[in-house]
Amino acid sequence: MAQNFGKIPSHKSYVLSLYRTVLRNIPKCCHSYAFQYEIKKTLSIQLFKHKHDKSSWSVYTLLNEFSLLNNCLLEGKLQEIKNLMKPLKKMKKQLKTTKILNSLTSLGDVKTNDPEEVRRFHVLSAYIKRKQDLGLLPAYIPKTYQHKLLLPLALNEHACLKLFHIQQKLKNGPPSAGLSYTKEGRNQIWFVRSPINKGRQQSKKLGILIRKERKDSQKNIDNLNFCEINAAWALHEAIWEEYLESKKIIKVNLPKYLEYAANIPKSTKCNPSSQYQKVKEWVDPVREIMFELHSKSFQRVEYFNKYKEKLLKNGGQLAYFDKKSKEMYAKRLTLFRKMSKETLPYVTLFIEGRDLPSVLAKYGF
C-alpha cells in the first residue's frame, strides 16, 4: 500500500532542512518585505497542500522546484522566482454564476449577460439532474437536445409548480394585514405587515427608524454599563474617605441604590439618597446620570406604545393596508379565472408565446 512521503523520516528531514534554509535565505537575499511575505505564504500553502501526497513524480517535481527556488535566492534572480511562483499560486474559485455563463456560451448564440437566460439555465440544470437521478435521462445529452427539447419541458414543469402555488394561495382566501414589531432594547417598534408592503415595498423611513433606534438603544446600554463601573469606583472612594474621617467602614447595597423603577409616581421612582455625605458626593452624580438614561429609555417605550395605539389601530395604516390587500386579492382572483378560462386550455409547450411561462407572465403571475 502506498505511504505518505511525510511519514518517511529521511524525506521529512530533507524537506524541513531545505525549508529552514530557504526561510533563512529569504530576508538575506530579498530586500522587499512584500515579496518576502509573498514567498513565505506561497511556500506555506504548498507544503500544507502536498503534505499527504503519495505520487512520487509529484513530490520529485516539487522538491526540484523548491531547490531551484533556493538557488535563485542565493543568486539574486528575483524575476525567475516570480515566474516560478506563478503556477503555484492558488487559483480563485469560480463563482456559480460564472460557471453558468460559461455553460451558456457553449449552448449557442445566446445573450450571456441576460439574467433571464441565466435563470432559464438554472431551471434546465436542476431538471436534468433530477431526471438523471431518477434514471429517466442518460448521463450524456447533446447541447442541441438540451436547448431545443429539454428546456421547454423544464420551464413548463417549473411553471406548473408555480401555477399550483398561486392556486393554493388564492384558495386560502384574501390575505389580511397585521401588526408586527421588532424589539430594539426596551422598545417594541410596531409596523404593518401585509402582502402590499413586504420586501422591497416596505417603507424606507421604517428601516431608517429601526436602524436609528437600534443604534440609540445600544448606545444607551453602553452608557449605563459605563456608569455602573464608575459608580462602583465612586463607592470605593466614598468608603475610603468616610473611613479616613470617622474610622468606620460604611456598607451600601450599590445595585439597590442604583435601582430605577418605572410606572410609579415620579417622586418615588428611585430610592432615597444615602444618609452618608461621602456617598452623596461621590455616587449621586453618577446615579443622577443613570436615572436620566433610564427615564429617556422609558419615554421611548411610551412613545412607541402610543404610536401603536393611535396611528396603526384606529383606522390608520392597518385598515388602509388591509383594504389594499383585499383589493389586490380580488384583482388576482379575477385575472386567474380569466386566464384559466381563456388561455390555459390552449397552452402549447414548444410554441414560444403560447407556453405556460409566457401565459403566466402575460397575466402578471
Swiss-Prot record:
It comes from Saccharomyces cerevisiae (strain ATCC 204508 / S288c). Transmembrane segments: none annotated. Belongs to the RRG1 family. GO terms for biological process: mitochondrial genome maintenance; mitochondrial tRNA 5'-end processing; vacuolar acidification. Its main location: mitochondrion. The gene is RRG1. It comes from the Eukaryota. Present with 1670 molecules/cell in log phase SD medium. It is found in: Mitochondrion. Keywords: Glycoprotein, Mitochondrion. N-glycosylated. Glycosylation is important for correct localization of the protein. GO terms for cellular component: matrix side of mitochondrial inner membrane; mitochondrion. This is Required for respiratory growth protein 1, mitochondrial. Essential for respiratory growth and required for mitochondrial protein synthesis. Required for vacuolar acidification.
